[in-house]
């Protein structure tokens, strides 16, 4: 591989790494924040007629009468919504990236994720948190597109290296996301 091609490949793999890393950090950063978030939303809008109030009543009806049980239930619901949407949208984003190009789809999904994270930071109501997780889950299909991009820019001999970059980004995202969320929850 010539030097300019290798340099372009390294730069592109670096961007793929950053894309996947930020996606996983965004997914996992909320995990340690669930107890504080849910406590806040239950206290501020936990009455009947609100989304969190209805979920709170359902959790108590199912025997989730402790904060821990409610946190596990709500955290599980939000994580499941995110993962389900990622599962549904991965093939959609993949097909679109085949037609429109990997870069365009990665740009769209990164912008969507950035918007959802920005809205999440300023979410004054629980339904906004749910909405941001829905949008983020839809955009998380970009991991499949990033993997395809890594395969596109590597030849058969280098493909393992390209897939390793994606795998390392996922692993480090799951390491740093909860740590950042934990630090934020204790601040």
Please provide the spans of the model-predicted regions.
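Cytoplasmic helix-loop-helix junction between adjacent transmembrane helices
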Residues: 132-170
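Helix-breaking motifs and short loop linkers at transmembrane-helix boundaries and internal kinks
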Residues: 101, 122-127
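Pair of pore-lining "gating" transmembrane helices in MFS-fold secondary transporters
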Residues: 9-50
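Hydrophobic core of transmembrane alpha-helices in multi-pass small-molecule transporters
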Residues: 21, 116, 127-141
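Central cavity-lining transmembrane alpha-helices of secondary-active solute carriers
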Residues: 75-93
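C-terminal ends and interior cores of transmembrane alpha-helices
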Residues: 111-124
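Glycine-rich segments within core transmembrane alpha-helices of 12-TM secondary carriers
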Residues: 163-181, 185
